[in-house]
Amino acid sequence: MRKLFGTDGIRGVANVHPMTMEIAMQVGRAIAFLVKKENYRHRIVIGKDTRLSGYMIENAIVAGICSMGVDVLLVGPLPTPGIAFITTSMRADAGVVISASHNPFQDNGIKIFFSDGFKLPDAMELKIEDLVLSQRMLALQPLAEEVGRASRIDDAKGRYIVFLKNTFPKKYTLDGFHIVIDCAHGATYGVAPHVFEELGAKVTALGIEPNGQNINAGCGALHPELMAGKVKELGADIGLAFDGDGDRLIVCDEHGVVVDGDHVMAICAKELLAQRKSKKKTLVATVMSNMGLEVAMKKMGGHLVRADVGDRYVVECMRKNGYSFGGEQSGHLVFLEHMTTGDGILAALQILAIMKKRKKTLSELAQVMQSFPQVLKNVRTAKKISVDSIVGFADAVKKYEMQLGDTGRILVRPSGTEPVIRVMVEGLDSAEINDIADELCELIRRVSNS
């Protein structure tokens, strides 16, 4: 059983186990120990978002890595995909991201990329856990003259901006586009405005004044209403909202209507199919994606494959089976042609390129898919419980699944990052699926509160 790592690295309240300085230093030691294979200077990239606790955790990880004789390259606040890019660009042995993504500023986390820019597999995370908890590394520390050094890459942001612009077709510019962006006071604040402005767009930027405590606070991908309202107010062409670490994108059309990740995937999949760039004509989504996406893919002549929730599992499925595009309803979009992980800014550029090429608004492009009614409810639990242990729960789910038939489905799963059980119900009748979700949530609450 995992003791440190969840579905997306290690995460928790800063300065509380497991997100303590002591654990962070041990994680740094473990990563350094695992990458040391040959007799040469090894290097690990470290980047972060804009949380107050990022500096504390960064220093602890740096100390751990250097104490094992490995050098550190610091890039400062940079989106998660930017850190993956710099890791591969600098031929580093690994990359470390200090971020809790869309969570409030009190939380923080540690995510790790391998030298190829992909997140560590489960087996490698378990090795790190074992090393951290066993204390075996204390006997393996090098002599004083062999400790590592930490240095800063001053132009990391600029390198990433150039990379992003190169993913946008060179025959197009964004001249004539008015774009509203919301950077959530997070890692994209110093990157996104420059990318879109340098490509010729008029940019209205929100969420670009981080103070260490305002990341994701009433803004960004979790609060697209801020971006949408500004689009309507200014008559902009599109709105783009990123989460705290920049690996997620939520968009709104020219009317201020939010377009979720499923619709964006459908838009991009259609274009990739038309260009014959969709490997095996397959889109990889997750179990959370709407049934309407499945229907849309069939109409386009493509296929939908579902992976477990989490962009890392989407990427694992893509790599294992040779697929090129995938994502999540929540806004993680992965274009393996360009990037090894979800990248909000890169995804936005691909959408804008389609709008430019097809000479259509986002609202027109979004007609490619019609969503089935879907309700998603979160039940916060006082203690960790398994739905399998709830008496009568499995029978209730089976009964409702029979009631919905082939035009609906039920998904119940625990969150990988917080004490929450998510209940998703999909079907043709909104009132019916809402009632079903309420009944299932009530069963969970009774056990949680008992």
Swiss-Prot record:
PROSITE patterns named in the record: PGM_PMM
Necessary cofactors: Mg(2+)
A GO cellular component annotation in the UniProt record: cytosol
GO BP terms: carbohydrate metabolic process; peptidoglycan biosynthetic process; UDP-N-acetylglucosamine biosynthetic process
UniProt GO MF annotations: magnesium ion binding; phosphoglucosamine mutase activity; phosphomannomutase activity
Binding site for Mg(2+): S101, D243, D245, D247
Alphabetical UniProt keywords: Isomerase, Magnesium, Metal-binding, Phosphoprotein
PTM statement from Swiss-Prot or TrEMBL: Activated by phosphorylation.
InterPro entries noted in UniProt: A-D-PHexomutase_a/b/a-I (IPR005844), A-D-PHexomutase_a/b/a-I/II/III (IPR016055), A-D-PHexomutase_a/b/a-II (IPR005845), A-D-PHexomutase_a/b/a-III (IPR005846), A-D-PHexomutase_C (IPR005843), A-D-PHexomutase_C_sf (IPR036900), A-D-PHexomutase_CS (IPR016066), Alpha-D-phosphohexomutase_SF (IPR005841)
Signal sequence extent: none
E.C. number: 5.4.2.10
The family this protein is said to belong to: Belongs to the phosphohexose mutase family.
Function: Catalyzes the conversion of glucosamine-6-phosphate to glucosamine-1-phosphate.
Cross-referenced NCBIfam families: glmM, PRK10887.1
Protein name: Phosphoglucosamine mutase
Organism expressing this protein natively: Desulfotalea psychrophila (strain LSv54 / DSM 12343)
Gene: glmM
